[in-house]
Amino acid sequence: MPSAGVERHDGARVISIVGPTASGKTGLGIAIARRLADRGERAEIVNADAYQMYRGMDIGTAKASDEERAAVRHHLLDVIEPSETMSVARFQQMARETIADLKSRGIRPILVGGSGLYARAAIDDISFPGTDPQIREHLEERERTEGATALFRELAVKDPQAAEHMDPRNPRRIIRALEVIEVTGKPYSATLPRYRYVIPSVQLGLDLDRADLDKRIDVRTRQMFDGGFVDEVARLRSHLGPTAARALGYQQVIDHLDGLVDLDDTMADIAQKTKRLARKQMGWFGRDPRIHWLSALNPALVDNAMAVIDHADAGDYDAIDMHAQEYVQHHLGDIRRPSGAGPV
């Protein structure tokens, strides 16, 4: 039984599958949906990868195949043009509307994606304060004339908690903090992400050792090029907006098409940058103490995932999840995970 004062969320949780690129999140999501279907429960996948939302960016983003989409319905794939701008705030609204719609129809949502902030934005207590160009321009001018130290002193008065954990030599963060205070009328520290579900959820993380993950990335990179990635980029390059163009691999292939880099070096560069991205993703997800880490190579992976889901549905993790915020330390963007937490 949950202890007194702990909120109990009865019923099926939203399932969120996270982990580094090439770890097998899509496959696990489909396997879980099928296993739930065997038990008489409908489930559908909600994409939480920023770049898979763009139409036509299929190969370079490792989007679910037609066969995979036929097996389990996917949402928030191919919803915007590459020329459009996608923001995490816009995604949050779309994802929460999709989740609410699915739940209202008795369908369990399974979030799948490698974009850490996007995955959290869908289910966590995260707000995204707007910007004000005039306020920002004024603060930037003050930084040029008065210096970052003066702005930092002002921040220390308006939001001591924010100033305590902020580098006084980082004017960009100081300016953003003062801008948020001016725009919202609230302390900047009050807008920071919190490890608290606003939608009852359970997070499954896929874990691999570095050598196995690197091998998967090398194989996937080769498969991308064998599958027509160069042709995909050639077709899309004139339509890529500033957000879509940041997707890893696309600019590298554009450089190849422009004759700046040969094909072998392009593939090697993409593989190396993907491995670097995977390390960053593991660092990001590793800070969240609520994630249940599962070995991606364990033959019993799906069974283990279902066991975690069943425990979550029964409320067995509620007490831990409710106190997750106490297990981490905020450094205004550098959120550290306690030692000792490892894969399940």
UniProtKB/Swiss-Prot annotation:
Cofactors required: Mg(2+)
Assigned keywords, A-Z: ATP-binding, Magnesium, Nucleotide-binding, Transferase, tRNA processing
Quaternary structure annotation from Swiss-Prot or TrEMBL: Monomer.
Positions that bind substrate: 21-26
GO process terms (BP): tRNA modification
Pfam families assigned to the protein according to its UniProt record, in alphabetical order: IPPT
EC number(s) stated in the UniProt entry for this protein: 2.5.1.75
Reactions the enzyme catalyzes: adenosine(37) in tRNA + dimethylallyl diphosphate = N(6)-dimethylallyladenosine(37) in tRNA + diphosphate
Originating organism: Bifidobacterium animalis subsp. lactis (strain AD011)
UniProt KW Nucleotide-binding keyword: yes
Stored InterPro entries: Dimethylallyltransferase, IPT, P-loop_NTPase
Entry superkingdom: Bacteria
Family: Belongs to the IPP transferase family.
Functional description taken from the UniProt entry: Catalyzes the transfer of a dimethylallyl group onto the adenine at position 37 in tRNAs that read codons beginning with uridine, leading to the formation of N6-(dimethylallyl)adenosine (i(6)A).
Site (Interaction with substrate tRNA): 115, 136
Binding residue positions for ATP: 19-26
MF terms in GO: ATP binding; tRNA dimethylallyltransferase activity
The protein's name in its UniProt record: tRNA dimethylallyltransferase
Top EC class for this record: transferase
